[in-house]
Swiss-Prot record:
Source species of the chain: Prochlorococcus marinus subsp. pastoris (strain CCMP1986 / NIES-2087 / MED4)
Subunit structure: Heteromultimer composed of HisG and HisZ subunits.
Chief location category: cytoplasm
Protein name per Swiss-Prot or TrEMBL: ATP phosphoribosyltransferase regulatory subunit
NCBIfam families for the chain: PRK12292.2-1 (NF008939)
Domain of life: Bacteria
Amino acid sequence: MSDIKEFNLIDVRNNSSIVNDLNNVYKLWGYEEISPSFINNLETIKGREVIDGDELIGIVSNSSLCLRPEMTTSIVKLTSTRLLNKKRPIRLFNSGIVFNKKQSYKNTYKFQENLQSGIELISYDTQYPEIEVINILFDAIDNINLIDSCNLTLLVSTTKIMDLILFNYKNNNYEEIKKCMVNLDHESLDKLNIDNNDKAILKELLFTRGEPAIILKKLKNIYGNNNVIEELDCLFNTLSKISKKYNIKIQLDPTYQPHLNLYAGIVFQLICDNKNVKTIIAKGGRYDELVRYFNPNEKIINGIGFTISIDNLRELIVEKSQTKKKVLLLFKNSYLLDKGINEQKALQKKGIITILYLNPCNDNSKANILMKEHNCTEIQWIK
């Protein structure tokens, strides 16, 4: 069973327009384009446990390969090979299709392909590379003409908060507690054999999310002063100012954990609430350990990036008006064909979309029908 994308022409046009608009923003921030291979080494993906092996789509002719489930791993690997001598920091952007499969009913799988666009910032010698990456995300989305009813929220967390929450349970129901917190499973948490006071704290944190300053204060009251909370306080102080300029809300969710096992540190999602229908537009986070894995000798071991779902974004844009001039060239006599070819080229050099009808046409009513069939805005007769 497969989820094959058969886009109509409008979808294809909108996809291309969105990707081009995003690429133009990335370039203004100094990012260079890269195109990772569609084929990944299976052991590279499995070795880093980036994604569940059951979600990978293998290659029948070579069991050691798979279609790429995401692009970050391939790009980070390049920094230790072809890009090893490139000056740091490395700023890259990409766009393309990723592939995965999801378990469906009766032990069958549903194949999926998703078009995405994103950036990677690797080995940036600064404490908070998140500031640049999230700023670019806001700028990129701001350059896309979204529908007015799309209210944006950046949901942020860090794997370090979950580490802080689970610190006292390393030898006592660690995995069970983590699963309950990530899945917001109040019922299973209630059944665990742990101290009642601890259980009450975990229950309170289970549905804790909101304005970062308020959530950080709550965490500080529970866990006291520590580096994790202080660093988040500094980061959100800057991000909150940036988000206000773009009219994007920021929420801190201590229990949010990403699906891909790429990230260690800050993780985030950009969510659109369109009339109470929530859509994830973008995902991202830090992957310092992935950088270390591929290049342990890297002097500045950090990496962060995001991916934007073009498929989801396309459903939320205001479609651009297609009133661009498009000329249909017609002639009444066959001997005018050569002149028509020259005229078509002359108009195209001026940037005018031009279609030359290769058969003679002597009927004005037929000419109007041809103009509509070719979606042209006007007719020019070759004389």
